[in-house]
């Protein structure tokens, strides 16, 4: 068709003469006009004309289109396009589109190009739609690190469109301390050369970069196989590298040989191939050798340049860039807690006032000593602000009608109890008169319950005024929370009602000010099962595509899958973590920020780094959502009972954990379940109820121990369970919570700091050192105890268990004394899979489905939904004792 057409040298001057004084219009003009300008330069003609790009113009006039391809615009504007990608038809369609756009411009009172340029200045949305290039940004100084984080944040928050982007103008704004490299084949310079841009344009591009990059031929070999590039063979690729080197020499820019590393070793490409296939890439099998080359390998890759030039770009210039960089680390090493003015005195005043209100003036010596010791440690180590923040959050929730449950070891702090942060009183069991402040801490009656719970003690009348004494204390050492020297990093975790959690999060902004709090970011990685699925499906799809069987043994699939495990998959947010930025600091000195999972529809902003990476810098508040406070709020509304007034020594409630008598039913009525604990938080699962049956709890403190056992990892199964069955330990002597270890070892005469260190090591699953074992044996610690310590993988603190059992007990109390209110609250809040037709049509029909689901469970064919339904069915069966059937809706 063009065989006999004039050569470019003949026709181009005529074409440019024809265009003289006119405005050129093109669709994706940057690409098309680059060829004209390039060819014109080669024959000595300078092209200086105004160009309008219908892509950019359409983005300005019609910003809501999903793309701006020529065929998309023709359909949108009802323009005829008969043979797309045929030059004449495309040009005609572009002209028709432009004519319609001219009318749209006049409608907007834009009569000329000058006004168009003024009105069409780039905003964030327009920038998002621009063609993008890769570049390398290195931080060469501390200021550069901060500027880099500013750019990363902007790329995720302002300019994200399918992936993060940043305009060059923003790079220039924050250029201090940054070194900019021209990157790979997807970089602006390489693309300009491949697309035949003019020398002037290439010179402009080069001027932006601090150094230029060339890469091994194998990295870009794919260009030879594609028709999109005017690259015919490897020599063309070498010529492109030679041109980049020549540009570096011409413009005094160092040229560096880089690898564009995506994996470490050559054989690791299989992992990238599988991950890309799992994400739907059609060309996943065409992997370039993007591994980390050695210096010798890189010198060999560039030997076509001669040994001197190869050494210069591989070794000398690489080190030149390195020497431009200071020694910096990605995260700041210093701790920057938030500041609340007068927090030290504020905490001391709140705690002392509450202690005087509760225990009277003067305070009992044991109370005063504990409170003073804690406050001195908390304040001297700079943790008072953490307490005040928690106090403000809890008090606000309480004022709004919701209890807050404590998590972790904060309940071991008496100061936290006095500040109203936790309900757990960690003092040793004691009697206290609420009327005249009479107290007993060291009587023989009290000493019998050392290590237990005050609520387990028998009732007693005040010998001074005749009022019934309160029974208090869980006997938890403060050192579990802060260490003996205040050298343990404390963490205050709180369980707010799931209905109230978002309000608690918002209240942190009230405390610290707008822009000072961020959601704690997380990084989601490829899990083991997901990786296995990727590998399995990869070979399955490959087999179907190639029409031949590809058989891989399970062990081979697992081996390959192991290389895909823990690869970053997505980002997210901690369910309750709030990171607090001190006033006066900039978040970018610690971390970039972004939307979780790059969801631009949400207003939530998270830390870009996983919060663990910066938890030594910034305070993270754990403001979690939990169902217990929500359920207790509903029970309070239904019954009028103040949950704080519910006694923790009810024999009827305690009996739920031993049999079904308090409910007036038999195990036969509820499918053979021997206990009344169904539907009680922490104790209603088959696993927990079997623990109750095995341990036979008699006291509230036994329930705390059982909760510790059930929450831990390798604490009960294959450990305490075995020891109790063998008669080596009881529920009272087995290791149930981390505190047990430290207290027991100190009682054995081991130095307190050593006991604390052993506890910390064991509770994290790190076992015991030989030296620690020797110390324990020297102090007559039995072998079974040492064996138990070495089996433990993770242990919860006693304060955590106590707080959870207190919440569970209140629910259990309502199950015994206010059953209909209990079931109403349970099915409103805790039921996950309630099915009216299966569960509310009579006991016979219900039990038919229960038997059916239990049979499926034994055969391993039950689905997750059916598993959830079965849990709810068992509570409904429980409820049928109190009502013949649910009222028909």
Describe the residue ranges of each PLM region.
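Noncatalytic, beta-rich nucleic-acid-contacting surfaces in large DNA/RNA-processing enzymes
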Residues: 282-283, 338, 342-889
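Metal-dependent phosphoesterase signature
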Residues: 1-12
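Phosphodiester-processing cores and adjacent nucleic acid-binding clamps
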Residues: 3-5, 17-19, 27-30, 34-569, ...
């Amino acid at each position: 068709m063009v065989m006999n057409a004039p050569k470019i040298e003949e026709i181009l001057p005529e074409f440019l003469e024809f265009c003289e004084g006119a405005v050129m219009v093109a669709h994706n003009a940057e690409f098309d006009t680059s060829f004209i300008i390039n060819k014109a330069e080669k024959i000595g003609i300078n092209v200086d004309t105004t160009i309008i790009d219908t892509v950019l113009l359409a983005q300005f006039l019609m910003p809501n289109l999903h793309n701006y391809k020529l065929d998309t615009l023709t359909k949108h504007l009802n323009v005829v396009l008969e043979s797309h990608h045929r030059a004449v038809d495309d040009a005609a369609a572009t002209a028709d589109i432009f004519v319609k756009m001219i009318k749209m411009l006049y409608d907007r009172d834009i009569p000329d190009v000058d006004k168009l340029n003024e009105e069409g200045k780039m905003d964030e949305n327009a920038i998002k739609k621009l063609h993008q290039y890769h570049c390398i940004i290195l931080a060469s100084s501390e200021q550069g690190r901060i500027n880099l984080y500013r750019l990363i944040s902007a790329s995720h928050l302002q300019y994200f469109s399918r992936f993060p982007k940043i305009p060059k103008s923003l790079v220039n704004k924050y250029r201090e301390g940054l070194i900019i490299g021209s990157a790979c084949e997807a970089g602006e310079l390489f693309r300009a050369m491949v697309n035949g841009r003019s020398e002037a344009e290439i010179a402009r591009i080069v001027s932006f970069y601090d150094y230029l990059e060339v890469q091994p031929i194998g990295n870009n070999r794919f260009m030879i196989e594609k028709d999109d590039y005017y690259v015919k063979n490897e020599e063309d690729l070498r010529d492109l590298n030679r041109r980049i080197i020549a540009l570096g020499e011409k413009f005094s820019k160092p040229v560096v040989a880089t690898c564009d590393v995506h994996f470490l070793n050559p054989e690791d490409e299989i992992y990238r191939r599988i991950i890309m296939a799992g994400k739907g890439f059609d060309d996943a099998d065409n992997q370039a050798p993007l591994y980390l080359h050695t210096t010798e390998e890189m010198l060999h890759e560039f030997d076509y340049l001669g040994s001197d030039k190869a050494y210069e770009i591989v070794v000398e210039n690489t080190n030149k860039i390195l020497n431009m960089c200071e020694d910096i680390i990605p995260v700041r090493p210093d701790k920057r807690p938030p500041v609340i003015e007068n927090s030290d005195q504020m905490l001391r005043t709140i705690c002392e006032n509450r202690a005087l209100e509760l225990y009277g003036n003067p305070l009992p010596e044991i109370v005063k000593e504990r409170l003073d010791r804690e406050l001195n440690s908390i304040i001297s180590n700079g943790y008072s602000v953490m307490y005040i923040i928690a106090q403000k959050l809890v008090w606000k929730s309480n004022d709004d009608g919701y209890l807050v449950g404590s998590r972790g070891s904060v309940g071991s702090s008496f100061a936290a109890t006095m500040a109203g942060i936790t309900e757990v009183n960690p003092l040793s069991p004691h009697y206290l008169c609420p009327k005249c402040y009479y107290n007993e801490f060291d009587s023989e009656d009290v000493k019998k319950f050392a290590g237990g719970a005050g609520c387990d003690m028998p009732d007693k009348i005040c010998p001074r005024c005749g009022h019934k004494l309160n029974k208090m204390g869980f006997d938890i050492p403060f050192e579990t929370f802060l260490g003996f020297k205040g050298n343990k990093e404390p963490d205050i975790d709180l369980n707010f009602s799931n209905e109230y959690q978002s309000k608690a999060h918002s209240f942190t902004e009230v405390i610290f000010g707008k822009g000072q709090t961020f959601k704690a970011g997380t990084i989601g990685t490829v899990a083991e099962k997901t990786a296995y699925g990727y590998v399995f499906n990869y070979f399955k799809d490959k087999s179907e595509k190639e029409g031949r069987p590809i058989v891989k043994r399970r062990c081979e699939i697992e081996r390959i899958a192991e290389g895909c495990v823990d690869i970053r998959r997505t980002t997210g947010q901690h369910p309750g973590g709030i990171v607090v930025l001190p006033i006066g600091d900039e978040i970018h000195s610690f971390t970039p920020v972004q939307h979780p999972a790059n969801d631009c529809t949400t207003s939530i902003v998270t830390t870009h780094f996983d919060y663990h990476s910066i938890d030594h810098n910034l305070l993270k508040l754990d403001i979690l959502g939990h169902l217990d406070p929500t359920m207790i709020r509903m029970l309070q509304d239904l019954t009028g009972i103040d949950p704080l007034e519910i006694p923790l020594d009810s024999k009827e409630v305690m009996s739920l954990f031993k049999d079904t008598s308090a409910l007036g039913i038999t195990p036969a009525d509820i499918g053979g379940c021997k206990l009344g604990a169904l539907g009680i938080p922490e104790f209603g699962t088959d696993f927990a109820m079997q623990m109750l049956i095995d341990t036979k709890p008699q006291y509230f403190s036994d329930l705390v121990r059982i909760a510790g056992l059930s929450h831990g990892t390798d604490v009960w199964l294959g450990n305490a369970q075995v020891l109790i069955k063998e008669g080596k330990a009881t529920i009272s002597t087995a290791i149930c919570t981390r505190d047990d270890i430290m207290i027991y070892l100190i009682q054995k005469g081991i130095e307190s700091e050593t006991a604390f260190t052993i506890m910390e090591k064991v509770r994290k699953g790190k076992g015991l050192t030989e030296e620690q074992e020797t110390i324990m044996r020297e102090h007559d610690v039995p072998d079974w105890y040492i064996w138990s310590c070495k089996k433990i993988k993770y242990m919860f603190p006693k304060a955590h268990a106590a707080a959870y059992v207190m919440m569970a007990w209140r629910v259990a109390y309502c199950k015994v004394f206010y059953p209909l209110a209990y079931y109403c609250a349970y099915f409103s809040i805790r039921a996950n899979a309630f099915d009216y037709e299966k569960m509310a049509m009579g006991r016979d029909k219900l039990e038919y489905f229960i038997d059916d689901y239990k049979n499926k469970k034994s055969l391993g064919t039950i689905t997750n939904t059916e598993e959830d339904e079965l849990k709810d069915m068992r509570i409904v069966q429980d409820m049928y004792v109190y009502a013949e059937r649910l009222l028909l809706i």
